[in-house]
């Protein structure tokens, strides 16, 4: 089982993946939405998606909408550098929306546990 981490910033993506790996999860990295779709097509053992919000060409919410339209209903956690608005947190199909802050290790661990146990 893998968690797909999507972030256009390679360092941020690697840090998120390392955080998840330190919690016992296997990860795959994608650097944009198209790479993510390729990873999803290639790896049938992906159980959760963790995506950055702000990416060039296709944002995290646009990727979520695109995947839902294609019938992909994997849990989807969105990460943002901004404080998530209530509207963003209520995006249809979104499992969780978390702020990339000092609490991320704890909030991400809790959101992943809830998504996978859910």
In which residue ranges do the predicted regions lie?
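Short amphipathic alpha-helix used as the core "switch/output" element in two-component signaling
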Residues: 38, 61-73
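Receiver (REC) domain active-site loop signature in two-component systems and cognate sites
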Residues: 55
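Receiver (REC) domain switch/output surface
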Residues: 107-118
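Short acidic/polar segment at the start of the alpha1 helix of CheY-like receiver
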Residues: 9-13
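Helix N-cap/capping motif at the beta->alpha junctions
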Residues: 29-38, 60
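Active-site residues of response regulator receiver
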Residues: 52
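Charged docking surfaces used in two-component/phosphorelay signaling
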Residues: 14-22
């Amino acid at each position: 089982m893998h968690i797909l981490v999507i972030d256009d910033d390679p360092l941020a993506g690697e840090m998120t993946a390392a955080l998840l790996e330190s919690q016992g999860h296997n990860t795959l990295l994608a650097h944009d939405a198209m790479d993510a779709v390729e990873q999803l097509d290639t790896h049938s053992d992906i159980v959760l998606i963790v995506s950055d919000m702000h990416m060039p060409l296709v944002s995290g919410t646009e990727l979520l909408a695109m995947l839902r339209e294609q019938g992909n209903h994997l849990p989807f956690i969105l990460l943002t550098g901004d404080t998530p608005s209530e509207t963003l947190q209520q995006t249809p199909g979104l499992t969780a929306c978390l702020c990339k802050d000092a609490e991320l290790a704890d909030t991400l661990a809790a959101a992943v546990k809830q998504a996978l146990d859910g």
